[in-house]
């Protein structure tokens, strides 16, 4: 079984690598993370998730044979669901989280996860209900302000998103990711103030976060080539490098998308997913952004086909 698991992961990695190399030609760059002949990816180790896989087996055994209270069983379902989520097995994660909720209907953390899954399925009303329930159960659940803010952001209710993103930022002003989402929202809500606010908020950021360097890039203080160099220096191991690249490609993609470079943004979103950091916000919403871009790309393809048809007829 061990040999089979290793070979399967290796084959998936090779397939993904080939697909990503094809994307490089879609992104025009003078250098840095992506060029026509070069794509920066983290090294993939087939054993990266071995500990999570072992823990899932152990939790499954306990759930099958263990005698416990509903509260204990709900906790185990939640733990296994979070592990499944970290492996990108979102269907299995959702099943476990639903089981946990059936046993313990007042688990705020479960509603937070389920709300996120509903958001990623574009069930915005269902997601909003779930996030509101989190606050009813636990008013101090900080990260739900981010998730509910994202829900508002993606339906264009930027004034409501601003309230949640601002509250999320005020809870930790040293966190650059809170600053980045405020900036992205303000580009839609009040673009004339977004850059000025980013400059001001950047002053209080911690250098302990990789995202601080992304903010410096957004401000124009460093080039994409310098950003790449800092990324390789910042990462202490291949897993951290994968996380850094996931974040970086996502925010580079958002920058491209905001200036109308849809094809380049799509390629960068795919690269954000290539490092397989499934439980990062940036991975989840890279997949979400790609899903939202499909109708746009489909309409473009229809127009091209229509133009070709007219050319043939006339």
Swiss-Prot record:
Compartments where found: Cell membrane
TPR repeat spans: 74-107, 108-141, 246-279
Q: What does this protein do?
A: May be involved in cell division.
Indicate the principal place this protein occupies in or around the cell.
membrane
Taxonomic lineage from the root: Bacteria, Pseudomonadati, Pseudomonadota, Gammaproteobacteria, Pasteurellales
Species this protein is from: Haemophilus influenzae (strain ATCC 51907 / DSM 11121 / KW20 / Rd)
Where is lipid attached as S-diacylglycerol cysteine? 26
Gene Ontology CC:
cell outer membrane; plasma membrane
* Keywords carried by this UniProt record: Cell cycle, Cell division, Cell membrane, Lipoprotein, Membrane, Palmitate, Repeat, Signal, TPR repeat
- Which InterPro entries does the UniProt record give? Lipoprotein_NlpI (IPR023605), TPR-like_helical_dom_sf (IPR011990), TPR_rpt (IPR019734), Ycf3 (IPR050498)
> Does the keyword RNA-binding feature in the UniProt annotation?
no
Q: Give the gene symbol.
A: nlpI
Q: What is this protein called?
A: Lipoprotein NlpI homolog
Which region is the signal sequence?
A: 1-25
Its membrane topology: Lipid-anchor
Q: Which GO BP terms sit in this record?
A: cell division; receptor-mediated virion attachment to host cell
Which Gene3D superfamilies is this protein grouped with? Tetratricopeptide repeat domain
Any stretches that span the bilayer, and where are they?
none
**What are the lipidation residues for N-palmitoyl cysteine?**
26
Partners and quaternary state?
Answer: Homodimer.
